[in-house]
Amino acid sequence: TGYATKVPNYNPREIIENLKRLIRKDDPLPMLPWFKSFTGEILEVSPERSVVSGRAYHAGKDTMVITELPIRVWTQSYKESVLEPLMKGSENSDSYALVDYKDYTDESTINYLLKFRPDYLENKDDAFICNLLKLQTTILTNQMVLFDPSGTLHRYASALDILKEFYCIRLQKYIHRKEYMESFLYAEFLKLSI
């Protein structure tokens, strides 16, 4: 009898631009989830799902630097659940991937320097490394349950469906605001002309 809702963030500038496109009677452009200051990559893999990737690069033969974590992955939990186990290896094996790591992360930037076992990264592709370092998460856009203009719960298939449904309401608000500003300026004009 309950419901779950998850509406990802979208770029306010893209929302504004799409509202302007609707006002001009143009079709809105597709929007991807967006997070301020996120420098990773967001790719739509289906209409209901986007993949969010952090950033890492090779800084030497056995060294990598992580400069961005996926959205909603916190630095402390990342160290505990990903980096520390990579240093210890699995419980039933002597294998380990990391020799050491340094955490140069601060409040505004992510910066992990990873030192791998000699030749561990040799012949490893980007997909393997991304999976090893758990640098990808997914964002689902199929749980957007919101109140519609009539006040009933409605499941929206996309952010553009939400935008289109509320476009008429927004347009009326723009018209009311314009009328208010015109009447205010006209009243000021009358005061000054006396």
Feature map (PLM): residue ranges:
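Phosphate-handling active-site elements
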Residues: 11-22
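Charged, surface-exposed alpha-helical interface/stalk elements
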Residues: 20, 24-194
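Conserved phosphate/anionic-ligand binding catalytic regions in large, soluble enzymes, centered on
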Residues: 1-13
